[in-house]
Amino acid sequence: MKAPHNIFHTAGFGKVAPWIDLANSEEWDGFGNLTDHLANPRWLASFLKHWNLHPLPSKDVPSRKLVQLRVLLRRAAEKVAAGGSLGQREISNLNQALNVPVRQKLVQNQNGFRAETVPVRSDWTWVIARIAASLGEMLANHAVERIKVCANSDCRWVFRDPTKARTKRWCNDRTCGNRARVRRARAAQKQKA
């Protein structure tokens, strides 16, 4: 029996942080075709499960709030990737998303004790806060210069640049990088002709 197709992992999600996956949930395939993964309940369930965001009833999905957060995260990524910084509006909106009641819980495991922040209520506001917090954590850990947006204008995938020199331009050199090189070569040939 063939294993079920996991649209979350095969599409390249789940590698860095939940905020990046949500920002990329509106996916351009590199040829100008758009897929809105937030509209797919299977993708959303895989996203929540992968990032250990408590499974919630799918009938209660706050689609509008998730789309607003996606727009905010993408705008933040584009500003930071262009060398700018977040404006007061973005910071205020992120802080608003982060404003959920939490409590500390002491947890013991084989390595000893640790304090854990847990929600007062496990609901969608907590999920939204955790997604927004993942961007805050990346910014606070001085990983700002690693946040990039694919240079392919038909893709615009948000990614974390893992290279030492932080010079990566494309989300995937084999796809978007090759397309860019082919376009440049064709444009050069056209100019010569």
Set out the residue ranges of the language-model regions.
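Short helix-coil boundary/hinge micro-motifs
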Residues: M1-V149, R156
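BZIP DNA-binding basic region
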Residues: W126, R130-A193
